[in-house]
């Protein structure tokens, strides 16, 4: 699916989109809402019932063209199906981490995968924050041409959709 809320079976009142529309290269964002919310603010001007919302990214023609091109790629190249295949490959390539003595959990949702490191797997006792294990993995990754994202002692794989299976294997080897 395109959105995590779909996987969770949640229908939000508002859905905000930004970087994914243009890859973050051009300023564009979208605020989507339900018909119920829209209708609560829609009326004749004379009623002065309105939800006035605007921003500095409104109507940028280059950004809109980039977003339309992105939507075309998603439609024409079957990106979601390809991502399912890549996500399955990423799960397979990182499965060995589950057996590591200092990995509490490998968890994944689509193309985002997290490896949680702990001092003791059995008790899930964390490392002392001063040890900065996530930072050590990040630095090791950079030294080996891999960009991994640590959040504390959890290392995230958040690859671009253009990644190849060979590149996923490289990330798994380096991590």
Where are these regions (language model features)?
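Conserved N-terminal phosphate-binding loop of PLP-dependent enzymes in the Aspartate aminotransferase
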Residues: 1-175
């Amino acid at each position: 699916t395109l959105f995590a809320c779909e996987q969770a079976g949640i229908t939000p009142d508002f859905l905000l989109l930004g970087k994914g529309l243009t890859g973050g290269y051009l300023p564009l964002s979208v605020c989507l809402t339900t018909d119920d919310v829209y209708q609560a603010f829609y009326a004749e001007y004379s009623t002065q019932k309105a939800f006035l919302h605007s921003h500095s990214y409104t109507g940028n023609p280059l950004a809109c063209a980039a977003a339309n091109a992105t939507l075309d790629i998603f439609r024409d190249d079957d990106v979601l199906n390809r991502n399912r295949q890549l996500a399955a490959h990423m799960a397979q390539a990182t499965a060995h981490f589950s057996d590591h003595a200092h990995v509490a959990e490998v968890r994944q949702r689509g193309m985002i995968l997290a490896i949680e490191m702990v001092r003791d797997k059995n008790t899930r006792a964390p490392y002392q924050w001063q040890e900065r294990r996530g930072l050590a993995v990040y630095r090791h990754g950079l030294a080996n041409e891999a960009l991994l994202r640590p959040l504390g002692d959890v290392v995230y794989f958040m690859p671009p959709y253009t990644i190849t299976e060979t590149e996923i294997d490289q990330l798994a080897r380096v991590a």
